[in-house]
Amino acid sequence: MRFVDEYRAPEQVMQLIEHLRERASHLSYTAERPLRIMEVCGGHTHAIFKFGLDQLLPENVEFIHGPGCPVCVLPMGRIDTCVEIASHPEVIFCTFGDAMRVPGKQGSLLQAKARGADVRIVYSPMDALKLAQENPTRKVVFFGLGFETTMPTTAITLQQAKARDVQNFYFFCQHITLIPTLRSLLEQPDNGIDAFLAPGHVSMVIGTDAYNFIASDFHRPLVVAGFEPLDLLQGVVMLVQQKIAAHSKVENQYRRVVPDAGNLLAQQAIADVFCVNGDSEWRGLGVIESSGVHLTPDYQRFDAEAHFRPAPQQVCDDPRARCGEVLTGKCKPHQCPLFGNTCNPQTAFGALMVSSEGACAAWYQYRQQESEA
């Protein structure tokens, strides 16, 4: 397949691995204290495990997993609010498939559906808007979540709902922004992060300039990378080269997709519909300043929380779970005492095991047999 196979060619992968090993031999990092590269994107995490890239790295270079999966950082209280809204008999509650099994204290949306709530999986917010137009006597609520990657499609859908004057369409907002989260990670003492592989999809929207503070303020190199083996390995080589040269700058490996300025039309749609300045709670990480998203005044009438006025939900994470440590790269999934036992894909305890982009789900799928051995 053109534009895919060439980025997975085994011969080129092995050549790049050999080049990486040669370059890494010049690093001051050791097997005991390797160069820790945080891959921020859940798509990167799954690609790394699927293709076994973590096992091909030199012993003095290591991947650590970051909070790049928006479903994985859904607070339990927000799921409980979703369940409460979905339980209204006049509501059709729409969301993406990944969110269906995320557990809250009052159960998941899938369990709410089993109890009789009208909860439906959609593939796009436009599908939810179409449902609203087809069911004028029902109240259709779209549960929007994700980083800047999915915000433009939500914004355009709300623009369409406003233009068409759809009165029975509502939006429950759980969009969050990536940049404040990276800053919050780096402000933690002893964060152990030496470099970043930044997500291609988010960067396609926000561009590369948004990351400059990581190099200038925190002196960490960052490379925006694609999702195929050669993309990721080339990104690692670029980071190793920066470390050898004692440089800290932002580089773009994924130039075939990501312009440095990002997608200006997408940014305009986001700015029209969303205020990107509120605080937001992240599961396992607490409240992160300025990472939340709210509707602008012109779109307030679509706000599901303002319309249904659900009771505020504050649910503490179980102290046995190490979700927050996995999300910040401080431990590996299999080091959590619940991993593979209480928490598995069939009976997930945490969202990291539920989402198709979660680090725990990836580890369970691709590394579980090794952990048991």
From Swiss-Prot:
Effect ascribed to mutating residue 41 to A: Does not affect interaction with HypC. Retains the 4Fe-4S cluster, but has less iron than the native complex. Can no longer coordinate CN(-1) and CO
Keyword flag Iron-sulfur: yes
Biological processes annotated in GO: protein maturation; protein-containing complex assembly
Pathway recorded for this protein: Protein modification; [NiFe] hydrogenase maturation
GO molecular function: 4 iron, 4 sulfur cluster binding; ATP hydrolysis activity; carbon monoxide binding; iron ion binding
Cofactor: [4Fe-4S] cluster
Signal peptide: none
Classification via InterPro entries: Hyd_form_HypD, HypD_1, HypD_2_sf
One matching Pfam family: HypD
Keywords: 4Fe-4S, Iron, Iron-sulfur, Metal-binding
Domain commentary: In addition to the iron-sulfur cluster, contains two additional oxygen-labile iron ions.
Family statement drawn from the similarity comment of this UniProt entry: Belongs to the HypD family.
Reported function: Involved in the maturation of [NiFe] hydrogenases. Involved in the biosynthesis of the Fe(CN)(2)CO cofactor. HypD may act as a scaffold on which the Fe(CN)(2)CO cofactor is formed. In complex with HypC, accepts the cyanide ligand generated by HypF and HypE, and also coordinates the carbon monoxide ligand. Required for the formation of all three hydrogenase isoenzymes.
Quaternary organization: Monomer. Interacts with HypC. Forms a complex with HypC, or HybG, and HypE.
Protein name: Hydrogenase maturation factor HypD
Organism: Escherichia coli (strain K12)
